[in-house]
Design a protein with these regions (language model features):
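C-terminal active-site-proximal or functional interface alpha/beta core segments in diverse enzymes
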Residues: 144-227
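N-terminal active-site wall of soluble small-molecule enzyme domains
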Residues: 1-58, 97
Length: 227
C-alpha cells in the first residue's frame, strides 16, 4: 500500500511489512515503521535494493532460488554484513484458485521444489555471509477455503521442524492468499444475505486460525502471515 497514512496506522498497530522493492522499503521508513519488521520478497531484487535492505537492517530476505541466495551472500560479504534469509519452498499443493494466481505447484516458477529444499539449506549453511532465519511458502491468492492452506502446512510443518533442529531457523512464513468473496460482497446491501448460510461459509480469520494453529503451535517457531 503506497498510502503513508495507512502504513503509519499499521505500524502503530504493531504490524510488520512484506515488501517487494526498495521503494516500498523507503515508504515503510517514511511512515515511521521499523525496517527490522520487513521481509523482502519478490523475484527481481536489484543489487542496490539488496544493499539498501542490508544497510537498513530488514528482518529477512525471502529467496526464490540458489543463484539469488549466492548473489545476496556476495553483496553481504562486500558490505561486511550477514544477510538474514528465508528460502521459499514450493510444496506442490493446488491452491484451488484461478490458474493465473496459483503459485504453489511445480508448474509455477516460484520457490524451490519440496524434495530439494533441505539440500539447498545445507548449501546455504556453508555461505558465510548468510544467516538462515526462516522458511517461507506462498501457495496462491484469492483462496476462499482453508483446505489448501491446511494441506500445505501439514506438508511443510515437519520440514520447518527439521530445519529448526538442524539450522536454527526461528520463523515459518505461511505467505498470504486469504481471498475476498467479491460476488457475495456485492450483495451485502441486503441485510438478509449476511444472516444466510452463504455468509457462514466465508473463510474468516477465525476459521483460518482454527485449522492452522493446532498444526503450528507444536513447532515453537515464530509464525508470519500476510493477511
Amino acid at each position: 500500500n503506497s498510502n503513508l497514512g495507512v502504513l503509519r496506522t499499521l505500524a502503530n498497530a504493531g504490524s510488520g511489512f512484506d515488501i517487494v522493492s526498495g521503494g516500498e522499503l523507503q515508504r515503510v521508513i517514511a511512515a515511521g515503521a521499523n525496517p527490522s519488521k520487513c521481509v523482502f520478497a519478490g523475484v527481481g531484487k536489484t543489487e542496490k535494493e539488496i544493499e539498501l535492505a542490508l544497510k537498513k537492517g530488514i528482518y529477512a530476505f525471502t529467496t526464490e532460488s540458489e543463484p539469488e541466495m549466492v548473489r545476496i551472500n556476495k553483496i553481504a560479504r562486500q558490505l561486511k554484513k550477514k544477510a538474514p534469509i528465508a528460502i521459499r519452498v514450493n510444496p506442490n499443493v493446488d491452491a484451488k484458485t484461478h490458474a493465473k494466481i496459483t503459485t504453489g505447484t511445480y508448474e509455477n516458477k516460484f520457490g524451490i521444489v519440496f524434495e530439494e529444499i533441505e539440500g539447498v539449506y545445507e548449501r546455504a549453511a556453508k555461505l558465510k555471509n548468510l544467516h538462515l532465519r526462516g522458511v517461507q511458502m506462498h501457495i496462491g491468492s484469492q483462496l476462499t477455503e482453508a483446505g489448501p492452506f491446511e494441506k500445505a502446512v501439514r506438508k511443510v510443518a515437519p520440514l520447518a521442524k527439521r530445519l529448526a533442529e538442524k539450522h536454527g531457523i526461528e520463523f515459518f512464513s505461511l505467505g498470504g492468499g486469504v481471498g475476498i468473496t467479491y460476488e457475495s460482497a456485492l450483495e451485502s446491501g441486503d441485510a438478509k444475505w449476511w444472516r444466510s448460510p452463504n455468509r457462514r461459509n466465508l473463510l474468516t480469520p477465525a476459521k483460518y486460525a482454527a485449522k492452522l494453529v493446532p498444526l503450528l503451535k507444536p513447532l515453537g517457531l515464530r509464525i508470519l502471515i500476510e493477511p
